Amino acid sequence: MTLNELRDKVKEFEKKAGFDKTDVKKILEMVDEEIGILKSNLKKKDVVDHELMDLQVLILQIANRYNTDLNSEWIKHFKKSEKYLK
């Protein structure tokens, strides 16, 4: 599954659940909260796994708000990053 497919799957879920109108600032507050939980539980793999997934979904929600083409951004990111490997 591509990043854009994951983004679209989250968009579909958001719409069904009524979360598709959640403001980006509110989503970022949730990101902060999830990062706090993650920081407090770094020795608990099950919690880390869960929080990473929560964060991924929140990032995909933000990408939906901005119609971000995540596949293209991924490619651009790594092309730009390659210069640091030389």
Summary of predicted features, one role per range:
Residues M1-L52, Q56-K86:
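Flexible "arm" and connector segments at domain edges
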